[in-house]
Amino acid sequence: CYIQNCLRV
């Protein structure tokens, strides 16, 4: 993931 809050790929 490329987001600040991501719990997946």
UniProtKB/Swiss-Prot annotation:
Expressed by the venom duct. Signal peptide: none annotated. Disulfide bonds join C1-C6. The modification Valine amide is found at V9. Changing L7P: 8-fold increase in affinity for V1aR/AVPR1A, no change in affinity for V1b and oxytocin receptors (OXTR) and gain of affinity for V2R (Ki=1.8 uM). One of its GO terms (molecular function) is toxin activity. The record marks V9 as: Important residue for antagonist activity on V1aR/AVPR1A (a Gly in this position produces agonist activity). Keywords: Amidation, Disulfide bond, G-protein coupled receptor impairing toxin, Secreted, Toxin. One of its GO terms (cellular component) is extracellular region. It is found in: Secreted. It comes from the Eukaryota. Coiled coil: none annotated. Belongs to the vasopressin/oxytocin family. Interacts with high affinity with oxytocin receptor (OXTR) (Ki=108 nM) and vasopressin V1a receptor (V1aR/AVPR1A) (Ki=319 nM). Acts as a partial agonist on OXTR (Kact=37 nM, 22% of oxytocin maximum activity at 10 uM), and as a full antagonist on V1aR (Kinact=329 nM). The cysteine framework is C-C. Negative results: does not show binding with vasopressin V1b and V2 receptors (up to 10 uM). Shows a weak agonist activity on V1bR/AVPR1B (9% at 10 uM). This is Conopressin-T. It comes from Conus tulipa (Fish-hunting cone snail).
